[in-house]
């Protein structure tokens, strides 16, 4: 990932650090429609996720998370930017004429070949079942349910590790630190997701964040009492509570938000680290 640092010619470019290496390609049958986000509203138009709205118009890129082109070699033709995710994407041309997008594995370059299936080589970008992988393999785009496609470790720089196989299950250590069981028949892709240095980017100005559809975040302590439990007071007043609270009065820090008695509790051997 190439980070471009701007000269401090204006206040807006003083702290900017962006990636100028990867471009976007809109001339493709896999790119279609306008991706209309909900802007944080539900079906009734009520805000359910704050600090979202606006943003530049986006086209949706259809990503192949299933990797069901079995035993057919594909070649990486382009590495492109995707406005709908932090990770980059690769355009793959398969030997049978099929064209698909996949998540860009870290270190993959244009011209590399990939393949998916059982007992394929343990090579970066190849997709195969967990039962055919040796212990200690770094993987991403991991299936939870067989045939449903990858759902875990898909963000930029994400990587999981295969640490054990026993019976019908495999034990994985996820990027969050969680250790859980998954069926050995589920597939995953070898390697780490690319664009691992995304956290080194600095937008430099508020307008760049608005392009991404992110609105300003206002602290509760500067609001009025009617708007937030932390609001009110004369001048810079403390929150007036023993513990911080959400705008709706629930405990803000340290409270577990996971649903109790969830079906997957038996599959989680160690909770994620915070």
From Swiss-Prot:
Q: Name one GO molecular function term.
A: rRNA binding
One GO biological-process annotation of the entry reads: mitochondrial translation
InterPro entries assigned to the protein according to its UniProt record, in alphabetical order:
NA-bd_OB-fold, Rib_uL2_dom2, Ribosomal_uL2, Ribosomal_uL2_bac/org-type, Ribosomal_uL2_C, Ribosomal_uL2_CS, Ribosomal_uL2_dom3, Ribosomal_uL2_RNA-bd_dom
Q: Name one GO cellular component term.
A: mitochondrial large ribosomal subunit
Disulfide-bond pairs as recorded = none
Predominant cellular place of this UniProt entry's protein: plastid
- A Pfam match is Ribosomal_L2_C
Where, subcellularly, is it found?
Plastid, Chloroplast
Q: So which domain of life are we looking at?
A: Eukaryota
Q: Check the record and name the PANTHER family matching this protein.
A: LARGE RIBOSOMAL SUBUNIT PROTEIN UL2M (PTHR13691:SF5), RIBOSOMAL PROTEIN L2 (PTHR13691)
Q: Please give the family membership noted in the entry.
A: Belongs to the universal ribosomal protein uL2 family.
Relate the assembly described in the record. Part of the 50S ribosomal subunit.
Protein name per Swiss-Prot or TrEMBL = Large ribosomal subunit protein uL2cy
Organism source for this protein? Populus alba (White poplar)
Q: What is the lineage of its organism?
A: Eukaryota, Viridiplantae, Streptophyta, Embryophyta, Tracheophyta
């Amino acid at each position: 990932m190439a980070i471009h640092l701007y000269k401090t010619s204006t206040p807006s470019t003083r702290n900017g650090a962006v990636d100028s290496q990867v471009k976007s390609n809109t001339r493709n049958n896999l790119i279609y429609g306008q991706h209309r986000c909900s802007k944080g509203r539900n079906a009734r138009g009520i805000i359910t996720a704050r600090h979202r709205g606006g943003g530049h118009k986006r086209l949706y890129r259809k990503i192949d998370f299933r990797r069901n082109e079995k035993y057919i070699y594909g070649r990486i033709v382009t590495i492109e930017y995707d406005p709908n995710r932090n990770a980059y994407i690769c355009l793959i041309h398969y030997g049978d004429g099929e064209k698909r997008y996949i998540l860009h594995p870290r270190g993959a370059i244009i011209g590399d070949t990939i393949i998916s299936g059982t007992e394929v080589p343990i090579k970066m970008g190849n997709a195969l079942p967990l039962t055919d992988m040796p212990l200690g393999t770094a993987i991403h785009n991991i299936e939870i349910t067989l045939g449903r496609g990858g759902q875990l470790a898909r963000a930029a720089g994400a990587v999981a590790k295969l640490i054990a196989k026993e019976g019908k299950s495999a034990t994985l250590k996820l990027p969050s630190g969680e250790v859980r069981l998954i069926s050995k028949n589920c597939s995953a892709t070898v390697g780490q997701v690319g664009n691992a240095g995304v956290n080194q980017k600095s937008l430099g100005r508020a307008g760049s964040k608005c392009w991404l559809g992110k609105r300003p975040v206002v602290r509760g302590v500067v609001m009025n009492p009617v708007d937030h439990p932390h609001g009110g007071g004369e001048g810079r007043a403390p929150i007036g509570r023993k513990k911080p609270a959400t705008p709706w009065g629930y405990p803000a820090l340290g409270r577990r938000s996971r649903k109790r008695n969830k079906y997957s509790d038996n599959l989680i051997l160690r909770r994620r680290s915070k």
